[in-house]
Amino acid sequence: MILGIGSDLIDIRRVAKVIERHGDRFLDRVFTPAERAKAQRRAANEKMVVATYAKRFAAKEACAKALGTGIRHGVWWRDMGVVNLPGGRPTMQLTGGAKARLESMTPPGHEARIDLSITDDWPLAQAFVIISADPPGRP
């Protein structure tokens, strides 16, 4: 069963301006160490670095919308991180207030699942998040 859906569209140039203005202060406040490491692996191409951050920013916004909280009510930027499953598919890893919110909205006996789609096409980055609850024994 679907528990929440969120989407976000962001202008990559806007993220570039924020990074230029606030630098590490912004990056430390919003992104997990794993997300920062992923972006820095693309350091040879500045546009790819900024697009990587923009996609993850959009994913966090979309996830917060799917949780029904936005970035408030105990859900903070770094409580949500984009990670890749072994096959490469992206998903969200939640901690802190975001994890607590997910647990509170998941029906007893069900397992929460977060599906994430992220993409970019200069100058836009986009993310969709679907949070669902699977009954026991469902793959």
Curated annotation (Swiss-Prot):
GO terms for cellular component: cytoplasm. Transfers the 4'-phosphopantetheine moiety from coenzyme A to a Ser of acyl-carrier-protein. Its EC number is 2.7.8.7. Mg(2+) binds at D8, E61. The keyword Lipid biosynthesis applies. It catalyses: apo-[ACP] + CoA = holo-[ACP] + adenosine 3',5'-bisphosphate + H(+). It is found in: Cytoplasm. This is Holo-[acyl-carrier-protein] synthase. Its cofactor is Mg(2+). Belongs to the P-Pant transferase superfamily. AcpS family. The keyword Lipid biosynthesis applies. Keywords: Cytoplasm, Fatty acid biosynthesis, Fatty acid metabolism, Lipid biosynthesis, Lipid metabolism, Magnesium, Metal-binding, Transferase. One of its GO terms (molecular function) is holo-[acyl-carrier-protein] synthase activity. SUPFAM superfamilies: 4'-phosphopantetheinyl transferase. Its main location: cytoplasm. GO terms for biological process: fatty acid biosynthetic process. Signal peptide: none annotated. NCBIfam families: acpS (TIGR00516), pantethn_trn (TIGR00556).
